[in-house]
């Protein structure tokens, strides 16, 4: 393991105007201040934590995103995942951000970690590799992503939980047959950007360190499969839109700096880019700019956009109606991806789509 520290949204004039105004006045200048990664005293020792399958020749992976509500839909999705786990056990999970709705945790001992993560995921007893989302870094309004230090509480919680795995804001985990690289794109995709902060701003110390680390980690990885996880997607047919056009906002609020980062440091270097943020499930293909890296969106573990595809990117599968999750069966030569739907009136998951990727 390598670690490194330092409701559906709709496009609308009011929100766009507010956000642009916040950016213009430098509202985030004081919110993105330099700070070290939080370190909690903790109660979950390395010995008690659910073990990582670090030398696995095959993996069964649960993929969820935007899960942390603590409400009935989240429980329905995790109940469906437990049905699969009972017959074909998972080795680990990827949690793609927005882990604690609506405004993130107040600290590493916040009871929301229990009500919105531990209790809903009871019985899914394996490591959960967690990604920071915009709601996890809230400053002023839910999901603005403007208080980046708030996310450090989730890093500190790593030392208090058996299943929550987030040793730093960005990190990598070698898993034998696959290497996973969890990124923090929040400084480049916040609705209230960290202007005037040399630590957090685009081109600042934090993103420069993260880029250098990622370049080195991907270059030296010898795993058959390389999986990158972000909260914000590069490509997206849902209402949030893709990087460079998030929510129809002007630059830099539209994620254009994230778009450039992914194109420079991820595209063509990893096999998969898994993201959440949009409350939908999408299996996209042949995305221009990604140079063969496959964009997968799974952000429907507790919410649904109840919309339809914008059709901006070619898709093998899309669902904007149901909540759900994905599973991966990985060996040295193939990855079998399956999308599962969890309808409100259903007693279990529906296997909606499956596809196989080969080396």
At which residue positions do the language-model features occur?
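N-terminal secretory signal peptides
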Residues: 1-13, 27
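N-terminal export leaders
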Residues: 13-29
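C-terminal region of N-terminal signal peptides and the immediate post-cleavage residues
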Residues: 29-49
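N-terminal active-site segment of His-dependent metallophosphoesterases
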Residues: 42-112, 237
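Extended active-site neighborhood of metal-dependent phosphoesterases/phosphodiesterases
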Residues: 55, 82, 89, 101-226, ...
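Residue-level marker for buried hydrophobic side chains located in beta-strands
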Residues: 61-63, 93-95, 130, 228, ...
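Active-site glycine-centered loops adjacent to acidic/histidine catalytic or metal-binding residues
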Residues: 66, 97-98, 133-134, 183, ...
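A short C-terminal boundary segment appended to hydrolase-like catalytic domains
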Residues: 317-359
């Amino acid at each position: 393991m390598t670690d490194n520290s330092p409701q559906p949204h709709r496009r609308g004039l009011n929100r766009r105007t507010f956000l642009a105004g916040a950016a213009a006045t430098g509202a985030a200048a004081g919110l993105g201040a330099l700070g070290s990664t939080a370190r909690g005293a903790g109660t979950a020792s390395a010995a008690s934590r659910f073990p990582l399958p670090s030398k696995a020749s095959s993996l069964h992976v649960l993929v969820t995103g935007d899960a942390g509500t603590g409400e009935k839909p989240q429980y329905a999705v995790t109940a469906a995942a437990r049905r699969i786990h009972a017959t074909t056990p998972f080795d680990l999970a990827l949690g793609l951000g927005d882990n604690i709705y609506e405004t993130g945790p107040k600290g590493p001992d916040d009871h929301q970690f229990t009500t919105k993560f531990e209790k809903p995921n009871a019985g899914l007893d394996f490591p959960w590799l967690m990604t920071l989302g915009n709601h996890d870094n809230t400053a002023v309004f839910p999901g603005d992503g403007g208080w980046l230090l708030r996310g450090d509480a989730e890093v500190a919680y790593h030392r208090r939980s058996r299943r929550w795995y987030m040793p730093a804001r960005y990190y990598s985990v070698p898993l034998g047959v696959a290497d996973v690289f969890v990124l923090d794109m929040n400084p480049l995709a916040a609705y209230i950007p960290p202007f005037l902060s040399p630590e957090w701003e685009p081109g600042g110390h934090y993103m420069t360190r993260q880029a250098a680390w990622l370049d080195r980690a991907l270059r030296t990885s010898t795993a058959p499969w390389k999986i990158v996880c972000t909260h914000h997607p590069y490509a997206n047919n849902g209402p949030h839109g893709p990087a460079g056009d998030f929510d129809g906002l002007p630059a830099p609020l539209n994620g254009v700096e994230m778009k450039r980062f992914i194109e420079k440091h991820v595209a063509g270097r990893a096999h998969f880019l898994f993201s959440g943020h949009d409350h939908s499930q999408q299996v996209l293909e042949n995305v221009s700019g990604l140079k063969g890296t496959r964009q997968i969106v799974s952000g429907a573990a507790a919410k649904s956009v109840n919309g339809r595809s914008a059709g901006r990117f070619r898709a093998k599968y899309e669902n904007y109606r149901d909540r759900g999750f994905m599973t991966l069966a990985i060996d040295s030569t193939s990855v079998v991806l399956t999308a599962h739907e969890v309808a409100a009136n259903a007693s279990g998951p529906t296997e909606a789509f499956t596809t196989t990727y080969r080396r």
